[in-house]
């Protein structure tokens, strides 16, 4: 690693933007050398220390396709087949663009900080709200912190709800609320994972698990064939259409942790196209599985937000359930780790080197997540509500606006650490795309999507109530009559 760094430093680079960008890469590489303690190979480093472009790709792809694999067929039943496919592609590409914007702003922020203040981030994890603060000021910091933390909080809640929903299809002797208690305790162990730098083996395994599950859903649906009397009537209601659309918006809005993943890389500038590459792979999982399950079961999915509930119990389904449970533990860690960082910084413990002490101070973060998962156990509808109210701003509107404002002056554009991508030759083109995203997501995602998602969410509360003991469970068998009991 040190030899690679020396080779990079020997290259004469012209232009302030390239020098600043190279400083970002070199300082990140130095941090990794310090953390690994040399060039010697060890199994611990191989499994535990991940900062390559491949590590970032696995992290992005693994984090993007968690429990949404199981709710996308439900969204297809609300949208119809054609809209479901087209919106996946559209929001996937839009999400890749805003992830690119976030990566550009991270490089810009870090280059400016290291150039102006000679600031070292050796023991400090840069987060999205700090990027906004450094580039645009305290009001943007407050907005980024509020939206990002709330989204990640509910993202963690969704993983707990999904754990309880999935395990119920293997063991229904316990209700879903009890399973939520159990998995809340299990997921609390993520406090021992220091940062995204240490998710190497977990990201690799997590993507393998979702790949198995996606192809299980696809193959099992085709082998099952179409259910008797199946109908495909979607879309039938505007409220259902926009609810399904915002669930897909949520699916491809998993880059609330982009900055933390970039910071864990040895060369953060390489992140620019990684999210797009991850999204293209995710398409190979989400499009076939959602289409196949919807083809097989049609409108039945409107009352079954978890695709596992309609497939017959087999050892292959049980395997998929178990793998998804493990993956949801990993995704819980992905969503919660930035919250751990924020909490550590708030109480002045972020630079503590003791792993056990950091784990201890992180535990209070898990408690409200646990509590909210018990209050709102609505697997499926909660995804759409979070997508409409939080993802719209966190990963679409705020990054697009922040990019436009950061480079609003000619001098900022001239000295930018990253120029527009090769396929957009001018800054005007970048501004047009960003403005389109802001208007589209604000009107259709937040406006119509928020109305539809909250209408559906409130309907779930009215039907099942808060603290529902077993959301969408089969009703218990009728009790045996007293007279029949005496005759036995």
UniProtKB/Swiss-Prot annotation:
Keywords, sorted A to Z: Amino-acid transport, Auxin signaling pathway, Cell membrane, Glycoprotein, Membrane, Symport, Transmembrane, Transmembrane helix, Transport
Where is this gene product found? Cell membrane
Detail the disulphide connectivity of this chain as listed in its UniProt entry. none
- Give one GO term, molecular function aspect: symporter activity
InterPro entries (alphabetical): AA_transpt_TM
Gene Ontology, cellular component aspect: plasma membrane
What topology in the membrane does the UniProt record assign? Multi-pass membrane protein
Q: Where are the transmembrane segments?
A: 65-82, 85-105, 142-162, 179-199, 203-223, 239-259, 274-294, 321-341, 363-383, 385-405, 428-448
Q: Which GO terms describe its biological process?
A: amino acid transport; auxin-activated signaling pathway; root cap development
Query: What residues bear carbohydrate chains?
Result: 303
All ranges on the Extracellular side of the membrane: 83-84, 163-178, 224-238, 295-320, 384, 449-488
The record ties this protein, via Pfam families, to: Aa_trans
What family does this belong to? Belongs to the amino acid/polyamine transporter 2 family. Amino acid/auxin permease (AAAP) (TC 2.A.18.1) subfamily.
Q: According to its UniProt entry, what is the function of this protein? A: Carrier protein involved in proton-driven auxin influx. Mediates the formation of auxin gradient from developing leaves (site of auxin biosynthesis) to tips by contributing to the loading of auxin in vascular tissues and facilitating acropetal (base to tip) auxin transport within inner tissues of the root apex, and basipetal (tip to base) auxin transport within outer tissues of the root apex.
Name listed for the protein in its UniProt record: Auxin transporter-like protein 1
Organism of provenance: Arabidopsis thaliana
| Taxonomic path | Eukaryota, Viridiplantae, Streptophyta, Embryophyta, Tracheophyta
What gene is this protein translated from?
Answer: LAX1
